[in-house]
From Swiss-Prot:
Tissue distribution of the protein: Expressed in brain, heart, kidney, thymus, liver, stomach, muscle, lung, testis, ovary, skin and eye.
InterPro entries reported in the protein's UniProt record: SMIM11
Gene expressing this chain: Smim11
Coiled-coil regions listed: 34-54
Name the record gives this protein: Small integral membrane protein 11
Membrane topology: Single-pass membrane protein
UniProt KW keywords: Coiled coil, Membrane, Transmembrane, Transmembrane helix
The keyword RNA-binding is assigned to this record: no
Transmembrane feature ranges: 9-29
Protein species of origin: Mus musculus
GO CC, any one term: membrane
Principal location class: membrane
Localization (cell): Membrane
PANTHER family assigned: SMALL INTEGRAL MEMBRANE PROTEIN 11, SMALL INTEGRAL MEMBRANE PROTEIN 11A
């Protein structure tokens, strides 16, 4: 067995953990952005409907 490879395993695990964390944060950020844009559209739709009822 190649023992030199085993010396690099902790570094590879740290890189994998960092990559996973970055991907999770990016995914959460995209979901937050989508939710905010959807809420904005719903607010605009409610405003339009309330203006129609008022006039």
């Amino acid at each position: 067995m190649n023992w030199k490879v085993l010396e690099h395993v902790p570094l590879l695990l740290y890189i994998l953990a960092a990559k996973t964390l970055i991907l999770c944060l990016a995914f959460a950020g995209v979901k937050m952005y989508q939710r905010r844009s959807l809420e904005g559209k719903l607010q605009a739709e409610k405003r339009k409907q309330s203006e129609k009822k008022a006039s």
